[in-house]
Structures are given as C-alpha cells and as structure tokens.
Amino acid sequence: MQLFSILSLLSSLMCSLTVLGSSASSYVKFPVQKFADIINIGTQDVSTVFKRNEVLNTTVINGIGVYVVKMEIGTPPQTVYLQLDTGSSDMIVNNADIAYCKSMSDGSDYASTDNYELTATFTGPRSTTTSPELITLSALIGVNSMQETHLLLRITRLSSMTYTY
C-alpha cells in the first residue's frame, strides 16, 4: 500500500513537471513494464537474476558511517553511489546536492542550468507500536552543459524520534 502511494506521488510529480516545460518535447516519460517482460537486464538473462547461487561482488565504500556501492545508472551511464542501510530494507540513491556525493563527485555538472526540483513530504499513519514516518520524495530533473538529461530521485524515510537529556 505504501509503495502504491509513493508511485502515485511520483506520477503526480512527473505530471507537474510536464506543466512546467516550455514546449511539447520537454516532458519526462517513464515506460512501465512487468519484470518478466524485460528482455535484458544489463548483460544477464532474466532467468539468471533469481538464482540463489549467484553472488554480486563489488567494492563497498565506508564513509560518514554509511556503506555505499558505486554504480552506473542510465544511458549514457552515470556514476551514482547506492547507499546501503543494513538496519532496514531501504535502499537510497543519493541526490547530487548531498555533501557526500559532492565529495565523491567525478566532475559531472548535475546541478547545471535548466533544472527542475520537485519535493513532496507526507506523514504516514500512527500505529500503536511506532510513531508516524515522515517520507520525503524529491526529484531533480535537468539538462547539463552537454545536453544530457539527468533524473536524480531521492526517497527519504525518517521515523519521528524523541531525545531525552
């Protein structure tokens, strides 16, 4: 249910972006497919993705108390750092505006001209065992100086906390 809400919110944000565009060709379009319909994932066949005997070997970087994996996403490939949270099921691809990403930057001008930044925040329902979760979704869509389009999406989940001194 929560995933549906996030996807619905993302869809609304992307529709808002189309209104901000200056021409008919300045909108963002995402094809939606079932996982089984995707013919090729990188260089692997879909049938091998779910095999339990395969292991992903990658370098894990530890910095500022978090672990990240350096990945390439998109066409042309863009280097991003996937943040691993061993204490939850969340997976985060950091936004280029985060200080950690700037310190690991490869020199790409993600924060160039012609950017649109959309942010929405909502609070989940309170339960008897936990305080409400604050979920923030922000998307930065832009065109850099080489006319390459970038979409940087960040979903942040923060649980309310009480501090005692």
Swiss-Prot record:
Annotated SUPFAM superfamilies: Acid proteases (SSF50630)
Keyword list, A-Z: Glycoprotein, Signal
Stored Gene3D superfamilies: Acid Proteases (2.40.70.10)
Residue ranges of domain Peptidase A1 in the record: 67-165
UniProt-recorded Gene Ontology molecular function terms: aspartic-type endopeptidase activity
Protein origin, superkingdom: Eukaryota
InterPro entries on file: PEPTIDASE_A1 (IPR033121), Peptidase_aspartic_dom_sf (IPR021109)
Keyword Ribonucleoprotein: no
Coiled coil: none
Glycosylation sites: 57
Stretch forming the signal peptide: 1-24
Pfam families (UniProt xref): Asp
Family recorded in the similarity comment: Belongs to the peptidase A1 family.
Name this protein carries in UniProt: Yapsin-5
Organism: Saccharomyces cerevisiae (strain ATCC 204508 / S288c) (Baker's yeast)
